Amino acid sequence: AGGTGSTAIGAASSASGDQSAAVGVGASASGANSAAIGDSSTASGDFSSASGSGSSATGSFATASGAGSTASGENSTAVGSLSEASGTNSSALGNGAVASANDSVALGNGSVADRANSVSVGSAGNERQLTNV
């Protein structure tokens, strides 16, 4: 733990950001006020959090939760294994969901939101219906 007020727990874990926390083997929290929890998780964006094995939160104010999830856009959120939120202010919710455009939301397993200011509940060739609305 090299950052001021930081904590690192686990073999080869590192908490170099000020007020950061890294918990798990190889976990790394280098962003200020960041938290990485889980084997090989990374929280490098300031005020970011990554939880789950291999999760990564590199954008400022980003949150990645789930094994292999990635939140690289500023203010992005990825929840679910292998989910990815790379657009600014984007959210990917569900296993393998991808929100790559700015201000986009991908909802559900395998959903893709690749247009700005959009909400997707499926992907090309894997369309879904909204019911009981």
Q: Where does each model-flagged region fall?
A:
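Small/polar residue-rich beta-strand/coil "junction" motifs that cap repeat-based extracellular fibers
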Residues: 10-11, 21-24, 38, 74-133
